Amino acid sequence: MEAYRPTWVEINLKNIEHNCKAAKAFAKENVKVGAVVKANAYGHGAVEVSQACLNAGADYLMVATVGEALELRGRFEVPIMILGWTPEESYDQIIANDIRVAVYDVEEAEKLNAKALQAGKQVIAHLKVDTGMSRLGVQTDAAGLEAAAAIVQMEGIEVEGAFSHFSKADEADKTFVHGQLERFNRFVDELQDRTGKKIAIRHLGASAGIIDLPEAHLDMIRPGIMLYGYQPSTEMHHVADLKPALTWKARLGRVTVLPAGRVIGYNGTYELKQDTLVATVPAGYADGYNRLLSNRGYVLCRGKKLPIIGKVCMDYFMVDATEIPDLKAGDEVILIGEDQGVSITVPEMAVMLKTIEHEVTCDISLRVPRIYV
């Protein structure tokens, strides 16, 4: 990450703490919180966000990759869990650093078990169950139960928990996810009966499940997008009290009047109809400012919306600043956030891009400095 650039994001860690507490408030007192801080905490900064979540009462930190887990293990002693697949080449690292992993494949589990026994340790693992996401996990049929039973009884693996993931919890119709919950609980019950081994921590509910499905809170909840201040979707039956944590700002690189008839940017997709004050913003698609915002998006300045003109470039884009005639180079604009009662929010940007909030914030690249406030 660069030490200074004329574009940066500000992360309000107090808002992260507030959102983590809001997630925790949905669940019963004895339910654990696994804060999902994968993908650099959805672009917000994994180390800083993790500390804020721990301050707010989180019990576990959830990541997607070995590298993410090791980054956090260098700072924190709390349980850190990799939610996805851990390659065999990383087994030594996860054993040495006490990283919890997801297990679901017997052949891979046997290799992990052998590595753990060789090191004289037990790996703490959570059994991943595929209840309908069709991505990773043991199936809930007889063959899946046999595989899970074999894993649970391996000496070098302590199966602390079992988990799955809802595929439609953010939709208004909860029929499918109710089926997932029923399949999950039945499978884990059968596994315990077959092996005589207790699965201490069941977890299934991410942000949408936390808000709309209290019956899915089980032993641990996994807040993700709600930690960063956003509702999982507009179809939710309930609304959480959340505060967005991210603001994206920039200082203008050039402000100049260009004559009518001038075309702007690559391929000249925008032609000035009159003499226009054009301001150049030093951020582009290499920073995560999506090229699909070309000739569609806007930035904020002094309570006004300045529309993007021309295509978003790799490092810059241009806006029509005619409404602010005294604007000058070095003045500040807001790419995401609020200014004098006017806003451009992550959900609004997601709608413009026909995507979800998660992608908007995850796409903000590491060359954009994060400043914590």
Language model: regions and residue ranges:
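Active-site anion/phosphate-binding pocket segments in diverse small-molecule metabolic enzymes
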Residues: 2-13, 17, 67-68, 86, ...
